[in-house]
């Protein structure tokens, strides 16, 4: 997987997903369930806004002092027997991990869920070496078996599939013969993966939070697969975005409380694991060799700029669960491994406007994402700023839109042209007007009216109305 997950046109992806009634109902149910649970848990926590402000302060502080905490983290990892590699690009990160796999003659690698490894397309890089890479998160495993489908949700990657579809995938690909009952499906995957953990040469994880003061990494999971990935293989590789740091355990506790409640509405996940370095003498499990790969891949270019707040993100998907656009089109429409409002903001920054210039328009700018964010990222404002950059700096607005805006500029700056245009507007739009609205407009208005009605021009202009009003006042 890489940042870009589809080469199809954005409009074609939207049309396809809008016709997928199962996906839309599945996403709606999941959003409602997550939202209800989140509200219940945040209310139990107390003053939620105070918690949000505290989380925002922590994330802002880290970003403003990121160089210091990165140095502290790397120093403490090294003191505990680990190796640290700073990867400026995705290619540098994958090359470093490929080198580890070559040195270990790795035939089998087990992975826990990690968005950053999908961002850098790590699985494909390792498979090029002939390594068998096995996803151990249940949702990611389902998608891997289903011909490497991209995830449709940051937290629940297989959200778009129901139990019958999952059963059919396992039946077609692996000869599964049991029912579609969730407990039977889960037990089947558990038995399939058990031997994989025991025979894997390398374990690879992501990182929810790295703790600078101790050189530890924290993994927040519900399935326990990440614990096995880190406990059984002799070599462990952890891949993290450079911004995923907290200063101490105290800040980690705050952010974990925000994360678990915002993601799926839990007080705590089933497993919160903190790992520090290689195993000590006498330990029965843990890696003999540990590598921490810290990935930049465009993040340093975001630091210090107007989009820096997006690096506060803790990957909870609360914004996704609140988004009305995601509710209707699902995750695959975005064409990026990052979907929802997070993907709308982050994908153009990491992947470029050439591939993701449509995403900032996949938003109503309603602000629901901003209200849901546990660390107060002003998501809808960042999305709006993307639109401004696309038009003003990147010059990527459609030709028809550029011509329309140029014509409007000429007309608005000339009193004579403006007067003529207002007189002509009503009769020109009359064939398209129905009950004072334009429901199917011509030319540049066509795209607009596909999604909403356009108000019809008034037959009586303001100037004409004012002229007659003033004349009437004078006569009276």
Swiss-Prot record:
The record places domain 4Fe-4S ferredoxin-type at 304-334, 353-382
Chain positions covered by the region annotation Disordered: 452-476
Check the record and name the Pfam families matching this protein.
Fer4_8, LUD_dom, LutB_C
The question of whether Transferase is a record keyword is answered with no
Q: Which InterPro entries match?
A: 4Fe4S_Fe-S-bd, 4Fe4S_Fe_S_CS, FTHF_cligase-like_sf, Helical_ferredxn, LUD_dom, LutB, LutB/LldF, LutB_C
Q: Which GO terms describe its molecular function?
A: 4 iron, 4 sulfur cluster binding; metal ion binding
Name the UniProt key words of this record, in alphabetical order. 4Fe-4S, Electron transport, Iron, Iron-sulfur, Metal-binding, Repeat, Transport
Which PANTHER family did the record assign?
A: LACTATE UTILIZATION PROTEIN B
GO-annotated biological processes: lactate metabolic process
Q: What is the designated name of this protein?
A: Lactate utilization protein B
Task: Name the residues that bind [4Fe-4S] cluster 1.
Answer: 313, 316, 319, 373
HAMAP family linked: LutB
- Does the keyword Lyase belong to this entry? no
What family does the entry list?
A: Belongs to the LutB/YkgF family.
Q: Which residues bind [4Fe-4S] cluster 2?
A: 323, 366, 369
Span of the signal peptide = none
Biological role: Is involved in L-lactate degradation and allows cells to grow with lactate as the sole carbon source. Has probably a role as an electron transporter during oxidation of L-lactate.
